[in-house]
Amino acid sequence: MARKSLIQREKKRQRLEQKYHLIRRSSKKEIKKVPSLSEKMEIHGKLQSPPRNSAPTRLHRRCFSTGRPRATYRDFGLSGHILREMLHACLLPGATRSSW
């Protein structure tokens, strides 16, 4: 189980990313439209003004059950060992575990 502080930090990053998403998107569109380099540099400076943790690349996908940051399956939102346990217990409808 991940520490609660790390999970809360990740939630804070998600909130910040949602808050500054439109500002980042509009700044990137402006950079594409402006022909001169000096104006692009000004807009780029504006793009760097939001907090660092509001960047979407800072987000990390975590297991919603344990908070584990690695080996998380996108389709289920679970880490590998929790997914395996849930498949053995038949808690995920429609999913079958391959065995040979």
Curated annotation (Swiss-Prot):
Listed GO MF terms: rRNA binding; structural constituent of ribosome
GO CC, alphabetical: chloroplast; small ribosomal subunit
Residue span of region Disordered: 28-59
Feature: compositional bias, Basic and acidic residues: 28-45
Keywords assigned by UniProt, alphabetized: Chloroplast, Plastid, Ribonucleoprotein, Ribosomal protein, RNA-binding, rRNA-binding
Any one biological process term the GO annotation gives: translation
Presence of the UniProt keyword NAD in the record: no
InterPro entries: Ribosomal_uS14 (IPR001209), Ribosomal_uS14_bac/plastid (IPR023036), Ribosomal_uS14_CS (IPR018271)
Signal sequence region: none
UniProt cross-references to SUPFAM superfamilies, sorted A to Z: Glucocorticoid receptor-like (DNA-binding domain) (SSF57716)
One Pfam family linked to the record: Ribosomal_S14
Main location: plastid
Subcellular location as annotated: Plastid, Chloroplast
Subunit organization: Part of the 30S ribosomal subunit.
Homology family: Belongs to the universal ribosomal protein uS14 family.
Record's function text: Binds 16S rRNA, required for the assembly of 30S particles.
Protein known as: Small ribosomal subunit protein uS14c
Provenance organism: Nandina domestica (Heavenly bamboo)
